[in-house]
Every structure is written in C-alpha cells, then in structure tokens.
Amino acid sequence: MVWRKIVSLFRRGDAKPSYGAPKLEEQLDELRGYIARDLRGGYVDADAIVDNALEVLELQPHGEDVLRAHARRILEDETATYHHESAAWPPLTDHDRLEQAFAALETQGVVCRQNFTCCGTCGVAEIGDEIDATLERGGPVHGYAFFHMQDTERAVEGGGLWLNYGATEGGEAPALAVGQRIAEALRIAGLAVDWDGDWNKRIHVPLQWQRRLAL
C-alpha cells in the first residue's frame, strides 16, 4: 500500500544511529502486530498481509528472507487463532449489520465502499469514479459513504468505525440529507450511531469489529 511505503520511508529517513541491532524477538513481536491487524481487518489476502508487514519493518540485520519465513508462520498461527475465536461469534455480527446497512443504502442511491483507498483525502478524490461507474450501469446516485484503510485499522484496534459521506449535489443541505439517510440505515440494521448532524463531522459507528475471514 502506498501510504505504508511512505510511513516506512519516513521511519528510515528519521531514524537515529543505532547502537545495537534490534533483537529478532522484538522484530517478530512487531511483525505479529502488523499481521494480526491486517488479518482481522479481513480485506487483505495472505501474500499482501506478509508484504505489507515487511514493508514497514527495518529488515536489517536479520534480512527479508528470514523475516518472511517467520511472517508466514505467524500468519498461519494468527489465522488459526482467529478462526477459533470466530467460531464463538454470534450468528449476526456488527460487521454483518454494516453490510446490511450498506446494501440497503445502495438500493437508495448511496454508493457505499468498504476499506476504500488509503485515506480520506484519496477516498474523496476517487469516489467520483465509483459514482460514475454506478451511473453508467443505470443506477441512480444521490450520494456516497465509505471508510478507508486507516479507518479499518482503527476499528480493528477497538476505536469503532468512522464514515465519510457526501452528496452528488453541492451544498450543505443535500450532504446532510445523505448523512441522515446513512445514519437511519445503520440504526435500522441494529448499529449505534454517534453523529449529531454536523456537516463538518464524520459519522462514527461504535461497533465491535468482527469480520469473517476468507483465508
């Protein structure tokens, strides 16, 4: 992911001289954290999970080959653990409810995207392409809702989910109308909504992130 590479470059560029190489155990702990977060997010395939984790690590002195082998093993362990945990989940999770809400909104002309682009700025810049594609298929579009990759990570870490929203028509009133429609669909699906109708605020959904894995 581009934003991960940028973070990695900053980390390397800002690093102070090291008086001791990082221990392998320390790097493996850090590696496990990145892998577990992407795995539990539920949108990234196995190869990308490993690649993303290695991109943000200082690979020396242990080398990429060594850490990649450990990363594969860690991913297998974390996947088995997550499948075991998910067996005890309720039949309907908060993420299932989110998907129900998004599906309902799509029928109402609100284009909804999950884990969409690296950040909010890129999401707002690129959602127009998704709207255009929907219009080309003959569907009506009044607005959009999405959360980006960093939002997914925050949700996995227990911070709930934040949604961007907007309208195809300019101005505050159309955007707020779309926001209210989104909030209503989320509540109908059984999710709590923390949003006071302020145009300058994103919609917060204080959910428990439980997304079933395809791995």
Report the location of each language-model feature:
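Intrinsic disorder/low-complexity detector
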Residues: M1-R137, Q180, R211-L215
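A short linear-motif detector with a strong N-terminal bias
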Residues: W89-L92, G139-Y144, G171, I182-E184
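Acidic, proline/glycine-rich low-complexity IDRs
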Residues: V2-R11, A15-Y19, G158-L215
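An N-terminal amphipathic alpha-helical segment
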Residues: G123-W162
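Short, conserved helix/loop micro-motifs enriched in His/Cys and acidic residues
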Residues: I74-H84, A155-E169
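Generic detection of intrinsically disordered/low-complexity segments and helix-coil linkers/edges
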Residues: L28, G138-V141, A189, I203
